[in-house]
Regions:
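Residues forming the flavin
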Residues: 1-184
């Protein structure tokens, strides 16, 4: 009901409306963007790993979207300069590194690391912090209060955070020329 009340002013079912959704974004002082992605009313976060020794999460909703919970990925811009290499597959290596760190932080059991927003905000979430780059943690800490002003309750201290969502966009960039053709 938190999202419905923030968006509609009352639970959607009382108003004859579907579960509310949202899209939030914030541009940090350093220019890095933080945004929600793939909001799932009535959803939950599941492990969607495709490789041994890695944890990646994804959100999902059941058909009726009536579980009483909601989720979305909270993402921040990742730049090619963050990869630490100019290799064409550096983004893939970066993604795999984060997924392996999440696997280790979850006890090597394919359980994703979790914490509350309050714990991450206050630097008391070592499992989650160990599998996120410092720039991502800093960006989330800067953005969350602003996102909470856009959607009341989004930054509640008890909001759950689950790591990591690394598959929202391709880790490989194809360089193109002025005619949008692949460069060789």
């Amino acid at each position: 009901d938190l999202i419905d009340i923030a968006q509609y002013g009352a639970p959607g079912r009382e108003l004859g409306l579907p579960p509310a959704d949202y899209k939030l974004s914030w541009r940090c002082e350093n220019g890095r963007g933080v945004y929600t992605f793939c909001m799932c009313p009535g959803g939950k976060v599941v492990v969607a790993s495709s490789q041994a020794g890695g944890v990646v999460t994804n959100g999902m909703s059941y058909h009726d979207r009536a579980s009483g919970t909601a989720n979305s990925a909270l993402l921040c811009d990742v730049r090619t300069s963050d990869f630490g290499s100019e290799d064409v597959l550096a983004g893939v290596a970066f993604q795999e590194k984060l997924e392996h760190q999440a696997f280790l932080a979850g006890g090597s059991s394919y359980a994703p690391p979790r914490c509350t927003w309050g714990e991450l905000r206050d630097g008391k979430a070592p499992q989650v912090e160990s599998c996120l780059p410092d720039f991502a943690i800093a960006a989330m800490r800067e953005a969350m209060p602003h996102l909470g002003r856009k959607l009341h309750g989004f930054d509640a201290p008890d909001a759950m955070m689950t790591a990591v969502e690394t598959r929202s966009s391709s880790p490989v960039r194809f360089v193109r020329n002025a005619e949008y053709e692949g460069a060789c």
